[in-house]
From Swiss-Prot:
Organism, scientific name: Aspergillus fumigatus (strain ATCC MYA-4609 / CBS 101355 / FGSC A1100 / Af293)
Cellular location(s): Endoplasmic reticulum membrane
Name of this chain's protein: GPI mannosyltransferase 2
Transmembrane spans: 4-24, 35-55, 115-135, 143-163, 165-185, 199-223, 249-269, 306-326, 361-381, 418-438
InterPro entries: PIG-V/Gpi18
Role: Mannosyltransferase involved in glycosylphosphatidylinositol-anchor biosynthesis. Transfers the second mannose to the glycosylphosphatidylinositol during GPI precursor assembly.
Disulfide bonds: none
Amino acid sequence: MSRMTVLSPSAGSQSACSLGLILVNPRRPLRSLSILFGLWKALIFLVIVICPGLGYDTSTSLLLYPTRDLSDVDPLHFPLSLRFVRWDSIYFVHAAEHGYVFEQEWAFGYGYTRLLALLASVLVLYRLSVNIFGGDTAKQKTLCFLSAALHIISPAGAFLSAPYGEALFSLLNISGLYLYSSSVLDAATNHRLSRDLKLLAAAVLISAATAVRSNGILGGVLFAYDALLQLPQILSRGLSLAVVSRLAVIVLGGCVIALGMAVPQYIAFNAFCMTSNAPRPWCGWTIPSIYRFVQEKYWNVGFLRYWVVPNIPLFLLAMPILALLLRSAFWAWRLPSVTSKFSENGANGALTKAMWLLPRLAIIQALLAVLAFTSYHVQIINRLSSGYPLWYWYLAAELISDFKNSQSTNKCISISAVAVQAIMIYGLIHAVLFGSFLPPA
């Protein structure tokens, strides 16, 4: 009988486990997250590239052949990069190349078209998670790692790999939240100068995020919340130099965020309303806003305007993420139980202070969900959600809890694991639809 080398099942399992530890190892988060990011992006890229033809909508081809009949153009001659230019990205690319030529282009973030780039906010989210939950214990490290890993497979899918605003918005918004959380930690250790400088830097980043996507203005809730926190001190102790200086920094930060929305509107006002031509209708509004006007006129965006029978499938498509956003916002309010769950071995005061950010972030996320449900094209919540970290933390916490429970109860089915699998499947299916220029956008 000839001798054969047979790989036993146990050996195969050990090899698989070894490979898994290389790819997913919370002890080496930066390397592991970078590998996961590269693999997932490569898969999304491959799916989009192999989609055949020009797509259902051929608008992308106008970027290359604005005056040519497409019937005599071989689809194989189109650059592969154009497969990533779908839906709103056509506006982004055109504005980046030619400037803001048409009125409706002002609906798309002014900041992003001045800096087209593929940016990842995964590593920043990991550092933000460490600020909030700590990174000393195994449970804390796992939570932070899983949160960042979930951001990689965000339901935004192909939009985070295409010339859209979502990737840059996520980077700027999460970076702003990271600096904001760092300022809170500095406040807990009485480093006032560092606290104020980081708070203003956070405002600058959130303002830049607002210039990319208008929903970034919700970040102003953090500063409004901080301002309200000063009222009890003023009422009980009166005005002091420390309170006045703190309030001044907070108000200045809030004004900086508002500039992210106001400056593009001012530029548009000068372009359309301060000329010899007949002014546009919105120029005479009490608060002129080209953004609001073009959203209403060209996309029919407004309160309950999307609530029509043909859009029911889009509401159903958005419901899982809407439910996840609201559920995680409610979870964040349960601060005592959350603190006890992740603050093992006696968390220090600074960590407890940082975790008080969770209710503030819950307000922002809940507002986003309500606005998406009542006033937006509801399906875009699947990509808008990518820049908000709270639901990543919630889902990561549920994964850890479900895994722990499965070990004690031998329960195989985990709702959180099913949710993650559904997000991954949706991301792959959406990549096919995106590459073929098919809805949803």
